[in-house]
């Protein structure tokens, strides 16, 4: 082999070696890039998971709030319906009260004739029947005589001195009060003691 051929072979050998080294370096660099890319992908995946978890938590919170709001709406509607049932006859009850008052006033008068006594008994039965119907529908009479005056339940029409009773005691009742299912329909008109 001539020197030139040897030199060419050596150059080719060097070229092959260099090419192999370059190729190895490229593979290493490519592997590093791939590893970096996998790490980046992992970070991105973690970020995506975190975003999805946050969104999921937000949707859960919104769903719970919507459920609570629907429950409140349902309860409010039930309460409104219940109140409508309880107090729907309030106007009716209020309009009947003067009838009861008139019957009770008629019953206070003494009657001596036999016919008038029978009529009075009939009125008493009618009044009792009317009061029973009102009670059945949630209307209650207030009989406050002897009780302490309560401006929420009673209307003071007059004040009188009486040392036998404490101040603000109801001495007499001009007109009975009425409640419908615990709510005042008409306050009792009363005379109270003021010493």
From Swiss-Prot:
Q: State the Pfam families in the record.
A: GrpE
Q: Which GO cellular component does the record give, naming just one? A: cytosol
User: Localized where?
Assistant: Cytoplasm
A molecular function GO annotation: unfolded protein binding
Q: Classify the main location.
A: cytoplasm
Tell me the GO BP annotations in alphabetical order: protein folding
Instruction: Spell out the SUPFAM superfamilies in the cross-references.
Output: Coiled-coil domain of nucleotide exchange factor GrpE, Head domain of nucleotide exchange factor GrpE
Keywords on record = Chaperone, Cytoplasm, Stress response
Subunit and partners: Homodimer.
What this protein is reported to do is described as: Participates actively in the response to hyperosmotic and heat shock by preventing the aggregation of stress-denatured proteins, in association with DnaK and GrpE. It is the nucleotide exchange factor for DnaK and may function as a thermosensor. Unfolded proteins bind initially to DnaJ; upon interaction with the DnaJ-bound protein, DnaK hydrolyzes its bound ATP, resulting in the formation of a stable complex. GrpE releases ADP from DnaK; ATP binding to DnaK triggers the release of the substrate protein, thus completing the reaction cycle.
- Of which family is this protein a member? Belongs to the GrpE family.
Q: Which PANTHER family match?
A: GRPE PROTEIN, GRPE PROTEIN HOMOLOG, MITOCHONDRIAL
State what protein this is by name: Protein GrpE
């Amino acid at each position: 082999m001539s020197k030139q051929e040897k030199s060419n072979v050596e150059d080719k050998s060097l070229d092959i070696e260099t090419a192999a080294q370059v190729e190895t370096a490229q593979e290493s660099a490519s592997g590093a890039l791939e590893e970096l890319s996998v790490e980046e992908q992992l970070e991105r995946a973690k970020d995506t998971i975190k975003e999805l978890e946050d969104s999921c938590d937000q949707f859960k919170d919104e769903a719970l709030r919507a459920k609570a709001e629907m429950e409140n709406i349902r309860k409010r509607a039930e309460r409104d319906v219940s109140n409508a049932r309880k107090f729907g006859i309030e106007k009716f009850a209020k309009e009947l009260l003067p009838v009861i008052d008139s019957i009770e006033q008629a019953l206070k008068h003494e009657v001596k004739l036999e016919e008038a006594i029978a009529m009075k008994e009939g009125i008493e039965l009618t009044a009792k029947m009317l009061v029973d119907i009102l009670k059945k529908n949630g209307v209650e009479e207030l009989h406050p005589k002897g009780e302490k005056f309560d401006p929420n339940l009673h209307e003071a029409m007059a004040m009188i001195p009486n040392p036998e009773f404490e101040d603000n005691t109801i001495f007499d009742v001009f007109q009975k009060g009425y409640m419908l299912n615990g709510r005042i329909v008409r306050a009792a008109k009363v005379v109270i003691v003021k010493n």
